[in-house]
C-alpha cells in the first residue's frame, strides 16, 4: 500500500460521520425559545406563513399554535383529540361540514350556503342531508372534547347538536361569544340559557330539501330569557309568532341587529318589533311573505333606534305586511331593497311612511317605474344619496324636471337602471358627490 493510500484511509477514519453532527451545529433556531420563534414566524409574508410547517416537527407544532380559525371536514379528527392537540389555540371553529357521513365514491358535490357535501347519484330522498348527518350523540361527544381543551373558543358553528352538548360547551367555554346552530329546535334552545356571554347567535331551523326542524315560540322564549346580552341575532327557517318575537324584544335589551330569513312565522309577528328598543338594523331575506295579517294599526309602534331596513330576495306583493313593516321602521335613515319581486308602484308608495331617509338603494326591482320612484323620493326632504341598479322599468326618458332637480342636489348618485341607460354615462365627471352641481342637459331629458 502506498503512502498516499495510507494517508487517505487515515483521513477517512478520522472524518466525523455526518449523522454524528449535533443538531445544534446545523440548526441555529434551536437556541431560540418558542415564543421568540413564533414572533419571527409571524413577521413572514402571508404567502410563506403556511410553508414553515414543512421545515421540521417543531415548526409544525408552532404553526399549529398560530392558527386561530379552522373549518373542519373530518369529525374523526376531533373525536381522536388530534384537533385540539394539533391546534391548541383555536378561537373560531366551523364543524358543520364535518358533521356528515362522507360519501367516498360520490363525484357530486352539493353546496347550499355554508353547507357542502358529496351526494350519491342514486339518492331518491330529497331529505338526503338529514339521513346522512352524524347522530347527535356523536356530535355531543365531539363538543365535549372541544370544550374541554379549547377554553378560548369564541365562535362555533355546528349542526345536529343536542341540549347536553350545548350545556357542556357553555360550562367550559365561558367566553363563547358567537354561536351558529343548524337544525336547531326548541329542546336545543333549552340549554342555550347557559351561554351567558353570547353576543351573536344564528339559528337555522328548517331548510327546504335539506332537513326539517322546528323552532317555535317556546324555543324563542328560552333564547330570550337566557341570552340577554345578544347584540346580533339571525332567525332562519324558524317558526314562532308575535309572542316569541316580543319576548326577545323585551329581554334582549341591547340587541342592535335582527335578521329574519325564510321565516315560517304566524301572522301578526311584525307588531312585536315595536318592543325592540335598541334595534338599529333589520334584515329580511328570502321570505315568501312578510306578514299577511299584521293586526290592528294601534299595535304598530316605531322602533326608536332604527337606522337601516334591508330587504333581499323577498316577495313584496303582500301590501298589508309591507305597510306594517314600513310603519314600524319609519325612522330608518337607510333603505335597501334588492332582488325583490312584487314591488309595484302602488306598493312602493307606502315608503312615504319613512320620515328621514338619507340613503336609498334599489337593485333588481323590475316592476317599479320612474313615476313610482318619483312619487316617493320627492317626499323625502333629507335624501342625500341614491343607488338604482337593474330596475328595467325605470326609464331615462320618463325622468321629470322635478326629479332631475332632485338628482342635482344629491351628494352621491349611482344610476344604472338598465344596460341601455344613457343617463349613467352622462354622470361621469358631473361632480356628483363633490359639489352637488347640476349635471343634467336638455339633450339627456328629451
UniProtKB/Swiss-Prot annotation:
Domain of life, per lineage: Eukaryota
Protein name: F-box protein At5g51370
F-box domain segment(s): 27-73
Amino acid at each position: 500500500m502506498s503512502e498516499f493510500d495510507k494517508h487517505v484511509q487515515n483521513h477517512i477514519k478520522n472524518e466525523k460521520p455526518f449523522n454524528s453532527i449535533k443538531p445544534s451545529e446545523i440548526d441555529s433556531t434551536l437556541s431560540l425559545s418558542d415564543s421568540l420563534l413564533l414572533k419571527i414566524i409571524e413577521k413572514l409574508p402571508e404567502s410563506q406563513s403556511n410553508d414553515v410547517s414543512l421545515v421540521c416537527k417543531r415548526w409544525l407544532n408552532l404553526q399549529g399554535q398560530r392558527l386561530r380559525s379552522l373549518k373542519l371536514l373530518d369529525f374523526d379528527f376531533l373525536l381522536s383529540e388530534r384537533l385540539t392537540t394539533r391546534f391548541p389555540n383555536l378561537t373560531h371553529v366551523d364543524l358543520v361540514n364535518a358533521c356528515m357521513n362522507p360519501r367516498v365514491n360520490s363525484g357530486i358535490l352539493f353546496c347550499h350556503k355554508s353547507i357542502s357535501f358529496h351526494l350519491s347519484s342514486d339518492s331518491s330522498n330529497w331529505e338526503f342531508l338529514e339521513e346522512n348527518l352524524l347522530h347527535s350523540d356523536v356530535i355531543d361527544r365531539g363538543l365535549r372534547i372541544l370544550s374541554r381543551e379549547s377554553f378560548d373558543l369564541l365562535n362555533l358553528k355546528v349542526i345536529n347538536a343536542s341540549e347536553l352538548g350545548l350545556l357542556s360547551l357553555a360550562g367550559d367555554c365561558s367566553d363563547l361569544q358567537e354561536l351558529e346552530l343548524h337544525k336547531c329546535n326548541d329542546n336545543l334552545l333549552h340549554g342555550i340559557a347557559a351561554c351567558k356571554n353570547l353576543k351573536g347567535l344564528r339559528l337555522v331551523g328548517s331548510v327546504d330539501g335539506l332537513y326539517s326542524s322546528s323552532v317555535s315560540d317556546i324555543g324563542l322564549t328560552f333564547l330570550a330569557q337566557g341570552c340577554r346580552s345578544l347584540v346580533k341575532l339571525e332567525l332562519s327557517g324558524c317558526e314562532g309568532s308575535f309572542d316569541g318575537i316580543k319576548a326577545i324584544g323585551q329581554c334582549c335589551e341591547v340587541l342592535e341587529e335582527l335578521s329574519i330569513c325564510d321565516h315560517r312565522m304566524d301572522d301578526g309577528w311584525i307588531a312585536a318589533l315595536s318592543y325592540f328598543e335598541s334595534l338599529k338594523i333589520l334584515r329580511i331575506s328570502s321570505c315568501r311573505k312578510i306578514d299577511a295579517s299584521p293586526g290592528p294599526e294601534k299595535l304598530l309602534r316605531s322602533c326608536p333606534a332604527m337606522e337601516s331596513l334591508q330587504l333581499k330576495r323577498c316577495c313584496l306583493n303582500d301590501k298589508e305586511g309591507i305597510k306594517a313593516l314600513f310603519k314600524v321602521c319609519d325612522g330608518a335613515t337607510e333603505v335597501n331593497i334588492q332582488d325583490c319581486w312584487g314591488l309595484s308602484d302602488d306598493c312602493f308608495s307606502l315608503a312615504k311612511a319613512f320620515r328621514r331617509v338619507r340613503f336609498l338603494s334599489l337593485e333588481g326591482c323590475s316592476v317599479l317605474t320612474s313615476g313610482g320612484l318619483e312619487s316617493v323620493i320627492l317626499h323625502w326632504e333629507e335624501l342625500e344619496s341614491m343607488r338604482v341598479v337593474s330596475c328595467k322599468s325605470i326609464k331615462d326618458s320618463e325622468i321629470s324636471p322635478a326629479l332631475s332637480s332632485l338628482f342635482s342636489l344629491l351628494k352621491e348618485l349611482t344610476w344604472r337602471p338598465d344596460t341601455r341607460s344613457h343617463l349613467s354615462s352622462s354622470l361621469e365627471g358631473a361632480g356628483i358627490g363633490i359639489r352637488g352641481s347640476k349635471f343634467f342637459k336638455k339633450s339627456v331629458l328629451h
